Amino acid sequence: MSGRNRSRSGTPSPKVTFKQESDGSDSESERRNGNRNGARPKNNNSRGSAPKPEKPKAAPPQNVSWFAPLVQTGKAELRFPRGEGVPVSQGVDSTYEHGYWLRTQRSFQKGGKQVLANPRWYFYYTGTGRFGDLRFGTKNPDIVWVGQEGANINRLGDMGTRNPSNDGAIPVQLAGGIPKGFYAEGRGSRGNSRSSSRNSSRASSRGNSRASSRGASPGRPAANPSTEPWMAYLVQKLERLESQVSGTKPATKNPVQVTKNEAAANAKKLRHKRTAHKGSGVTVNYGRRGPGDLEGNFGDREMIKLGTDDPRFAAAAQMAPNVSSFLFMSHLSTRDEDDALWLHYKGAIKLPKDDPNYEQWTKILAENLNAYKDFPPTEPKKDKKKKEETAQDTVIFEDASTGTDQTVVKVWVKDQDAQTDDEWLGGDETVYEDEDDRPKTQRRHKKRGSTASRVTIADPTNAGAERS
C-alpha cells in the first residue's frame, strides 16, 4: 500500500478511489511539486474532491443599470404621466422610487455605411449611474426624470448599480404599461440562460455573495414569463412574418368608432361625467368655448376636435386634479334653481417651476388657454347658387334662302347691367387675325353652334314679332 493512503497524525484519511493506479514515476513529491508550479496533475479524475466556490468578481468600472433597457422603435420620445415611469421592483422602499431614464444610441457598420441602432433607454435610481451627481429634475436632453406617487426626491436609497458578472438585468415592468413605440428587452436573454446553466454549488455561492455585496437591490419580480412584454413583442413579430409569407395583411386595430346609440348614450350623461374624444368632440359634450361662467375656455381647434385622443392630452391631464384633490381643494358653493342644484367650484393648482415637465405644461397652456379668441368667425351657411338666368329654346323655321328647315337656338341674354364680371368678360368681341388665337372656350362654343343659327332675342314674349 502506498504511503499516500496512510493517515497523518490527527487527520482522518479521506476515502478516495481511482480508476487506474499510477506508475512509479507518479510520486507524491512530483505531484506536489507539479501542483505548486501550476502544472496540471496527471490524474484527471477529480470527482472525489469538492469544487471550490467561485469568488464574486469585482464590479466593472462603468455603471450598469439594474434593469434591461426599453428599446425605442417609434419617433416619439420617452414620456410618462406624472407619478409613473419607475419600473416595478421588489425590495425598494416607495420613498426611494424616483430616478431617471438615460437615452443611449449605438452605431454599426452596414454595407460600408455607418448606421444608427434604435435608441435604448436605461433606468437609474436618483444618485446612481452615469449622472448620479445630478439633482432630481436637472435638465438634460438625454434624461427623463420620473417618480412614483409618495416618493421623496430629497432622500436617496442604497440600491447602487448592478455588477453584470454576478447579476442579470431585470426586465422592465411598468404599472401603466410600456409606452407606445417602445418594447422592453427581458426574458430569454443572456442573463437567464447563463444562470440556468450554472451548477448548484456555484449558484449558491453566487447567491451568498450577492446578499453580502449589494445590500438592498431591486430584486427580481416574480412574474410569469409568458406575460412579459418581450413575449408579446415576439408574438407580434411572428404574426407579422406569417402574414408576409402568406401574403395577407396583418390585422390592424380599428380606430374607435362611435355609433349613434353610443353617442346618444354619452349625450344623456351629465356634463361632468362625459368623455370627449375623436368620435364625440368637446363642443358636442361641453358646448362652445367662451368667456361665460359656464363656458369652458381651454382647447384649441385641434384639441376641441380630438378631445382625449389629442396627443397632447396625456401631458395636459397631469395638470388636472384627481377626485380627492378636486373635492378637498376647491371652494364650493351652491345655487338652487327650479330644475336642478348647481354646484360651483373655484380653486387653483400649483405647477412647480423645477418640475421636469414645466416647460411642456406652459407650452400646452399657451396653445389652449383662451384659444377660442383667435378662432375665425363662423360663416353663415351659404344658400345654393342660383341657377343662371338663361334659358334656351329651339324652334324650327323655313329658311327663305335655301327653302329648307333651319334650327334656331334662342338664347335669353341678361341685361348688361345685370351681368356679372365673368359673364361680361365671357362676351369677348375681340377680332382675332387667326381663329386659332381665340380662347379655347370660345372656339368650342363656336364649334357647338356651327350647326345652328344664333339669334339673340331681347324680349322673349315678343319672339314671333322679332323673328318676322
From Swiss-Prot:
Any one GO MF term held by the record is: RNA binding
Record-annotated membrane-spanning stretches: none
Region entry Disordered, spans: 1-64, 181-228, 373-399, 419-468
Q: Post-translational modification, briefly?
A: ADP-ribosylated. The ADP-ribosylation is retained in the virion during infection. Phosphorylated on serine and threonine residues.
Signal peptide per UniProt: none
> What main location does UniProt list?
virion
Residues annotated for RNA binding in this entry? R106, R120, R162
Q: Can you say where in the cell this protein is located? A: Virion; Host endoplasmic reticulum-Golgi intermediate compartment; Host Golgi apparatus
Tell me where in this chain the CoV N NTD domain is found. 62-186
Q: Which GO terms describe its cellular component?
A: host cell endoplasmic reticulum-Golgi intermediate compartment; host cell Golgi apparatus; ribonucleoprotein complex; viral nucleocapsid
Q: Where is the composition biased (Basic and acidic residues)?
A: 18-33, 379-390
The record ties this protein, via Pfam families, to: CoV_nucleocap (PF00937)
- The family this protein is said to belong to: Belongs to the betacoronavirus nucleocapsid protein family.
Name recorded for this polypeptide: Nucleoprotein
